[in-house]
Amino acid sequence: EDRLRNNLEPDQAAREQRMLRIGKEHLNLGRLGASGAWEQAESWSAQLRRSENPLIQREALLLGGEAAAALQAHERSVAAYLQLTYFHAEGLNENQKFTAWQQMGLSYEALGRINDAKAIYSKISNELSDPQMKQAVANALQRLEGK
């Protein structure tokens, strides 16, 4: 795969788009249980984060956050999602925000940082308009009440 990283396309933008597609395919393979796919998705994400294109950076952070969480690398997952929500908040749609904040909360829970998880869930609860998303966040907060 290193050979592919360097020789995908002569044009930088086309190369980054192709790398993003490959990273997303590894993400899909990881969801299907393919061995090593999550690691590859995270690796492609790391390559793409150096892009000068903010849209590619945003997609790379989404990709890397999910891959890291799947690998139980919750510190890396939180870091990716924090970068995403801090540097690219304006470009995120509601579904992307929900995914990022929800996964960040789950990773904080996995790290035993319950107060941080509660803070994340409370923050997103105020920013969502979709009733199903709001209910999912309310359920997460309720689940954490006893902790």
What are these regions (language model features)?
Residues 1-147:
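Acidic, polar-rich low-complexity tracts and alpha-helical solenoid repeat scaffolds
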